[in-house]
Amino acid sequence: MDNHTAKDIGMKRSASELALQEYLTTSPLDPCFDLMNRDYTCELRDSLLWSEGLFPAGPFRDAQSSICENLSADSPVSANKPEVRGGVRRTTSGSSHVNSDDEDAETEAGQSEMTNDPNDLKRIRRMNSNRESAKRSRRRKQEYLVDLETQVDSLKGDNSTLYKQLIDATQQFRSAGTNNRVLKSDVETLRVKVKLAEDLVARGSLTSSLNQLLQTHLSPPSHSISSLHYTGNTSPAITVHSDQSLFPGMTLSGQNSSPGLGNVSSEAVSCVSDIWP
């Protein structure tokens, strides 16, 4: 597009814009020119042409956009680059991705119907395959996120259940500790009672043995007493035929033996009392 075209339209442009426009339209394309610089050139060209409404939308804009698309298609890495429309890259998620994919599919379908260039057809097919791959990838990611959310919900439920079980176990442990202390105190009390009972039993056995010993020493044998009584009854008096002048006042009789036995029993009691006061 030259200067007289702008004059025919009736729009006034500055000298720098005219120089840039002339350079862009007349300069040959460098094959070593970077793809990003080409895209930037196309975007800059579009911004210069459409930023302030210098030209209405029409065939001229379609021609410029087709030039930019051809520049992008000539690059070997254009298949790996995401689609750019109007200098704006679509990076939305969710439903916006679906809407943009539908719009891009319609646009690509229209372009495939309008063009017969094999390179354009390959590029469109490549873009469609990339778009389908992106759809599948987003679908897998969405399913994975839903699965993760489900797992998180289940883990939260398990966590709450385990926390309740931990609280119950803690309460049971505390009650068991209290019962253990009570049982220990009861065991100590029973031990003291058993010791007291053993002491009482030992004292009772000692007392009973002492009583038996006292009864044994205090009660004289029955056969000796009967023999003494028998002797006293059978021999009431014994007369010694001797000279009484040698033993004056000495008379032996059975009645004089009883006081001697009484003295023996009293001495035994006194001995026992000395041993066990």
Curated annotation (Swiss-Prot):
Keywords: DNA-binding, Nucleus, Phosphoprotein, Transcription, Transcription regulation. Residues 148-162 are annotated as: Leucine-zipper. GO terms for cellular component: nucleus. It is found in: Nucleus. The modification Phosphoserine is found at residue 100. GO terms for biological process: cellular response to glucose stimulus. InterPro entries: bZIP, bZIP_plant_GBF1, bZIP_sf. Residues 120-183 form the bZIP domain. The keyword Phosphoprotein applies. Residues 122-141 are annotated as: Basic motif. Residues 109-118 have a biased composition (Polar residues). A motif (Nuclear localization signal) lies at residues 124-131. Phosphorylated. Residues 73-141 are annotated as: Disordered. Expressed in roots, shoots, stems, young leaves, and flowers, mostly in vascular tissues (e.g. phloem). One of its GO terms (molecular function) is DNA-binding transcription factor activity. Its main location: nucleus. It comes from the Eukaryota. Homodimer. Interacts with BZIP1, BZIP2, BZIP10, BZIP11, BZIP25, BZIP44, BZIP53 and BZIP63. Transcription factor. Belongs to the bZIP family. This is Basic leucine zipper 9. The gene is BZIP9.
